């Protein structure tokens, strides 16, 4: 049951314990709540409806508003100290987890309000974009930050898309385990003195 229309919607759970449903959302706004029930109620509070943007990239997207150690973001302090968790701006950082097989579920992270602490650790590029967007549109904005420094673009694309580029060598099988190749050492011993 969604608080914006109080309509109950039902669905069935499949053999994997998964379910899916669609519900009509109102115009941008909130906060709202949604209650789920399997006989016992679970209510999610403080839900906003509005723009949601996926912000991805490499180190230019990964750098937080506070900057990296020894690499501060010039002029970021006023944005950090003036961050307001009551503002309709939400931040979600996907935790980095590598895999050699395509991932369909199980993303680790959580939505956070725009508090000074959370803004400081959030992607600077994503935050400054979302901050401007929220002020311009005057609607709630959600930012999903998913980046990894020095990652290849191929890692962000599915196999079907990549197969259209013959110059990219795709493995026939998915590597599930990693062995370690023994390294070699080269050392030239200094000549020993002769009598």
Language-model segments: what does each one mean?
Residues 2, 130, 136-155:
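Glycine-rich phosphate/pyrophosphate-binding loops
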Residues 2-56:
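Extended acidic/polar, glycine-enriched regions
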Residues 25-27, 93-96, 147-150:
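Short, flexible loop/turn elements at secondary-structure junctions
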Residues 36-121, 139-141:
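N-terminal beta-rich core of secreted/periplasmic extracellular enzymes
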Residues 68-73, 157-164:
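Short secondary-structure boundary/capping segments
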Residues 125-129:
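Stable alpha-helical elements in mature extracytoplasmic
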Residues 161-180:
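Acidic, His- and aromatic-enriched active-site or binding-groove loops in soluble protein domains
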Residues 187-195:
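Conserved small/polar residues in nucleotide/adenosyl-binding loops
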């Amino acid at each position: 049951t969604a608080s914006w229309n109080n309509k109950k919607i039902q669905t069935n759970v499949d053999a994997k314990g998964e379910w899916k449903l669609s519900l009509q959302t109102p115009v941008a706004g909130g906060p709202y709540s949604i209650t789920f029930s399997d006989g016992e109620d679970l209510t999610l509070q403080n839900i906003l409806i509005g723009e949601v943007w996926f912000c991805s990239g490499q180190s230019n997207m990964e750098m937080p508003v506070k900057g990296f150690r020894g690499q501060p973001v010039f002029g970021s302090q006023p944005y950090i100290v003036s961050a307001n968790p009551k503002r309709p701006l939400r931040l979600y950082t996907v935790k980095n987890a590598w895999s050699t097989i395509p991932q369909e579920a199980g993303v680790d992270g959580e939505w956070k309000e725009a508090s000074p602490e959370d803004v400081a650790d959030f992607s600077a590029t994503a935050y400054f974009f979302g901050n401007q967007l929220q002020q311009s549109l005057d609607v709630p904005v959600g930012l999903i930050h998913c980046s990894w420094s020095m990652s290849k673009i191929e890692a962000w694309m599915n196999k079907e898309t990549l197969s259209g580029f013959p110059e990219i060598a795709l493995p026939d099988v998915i590597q599930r385990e990693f062995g370690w190749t023994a390294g070699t050492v080269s050392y030239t011993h200094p000549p020993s003195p002769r009598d």
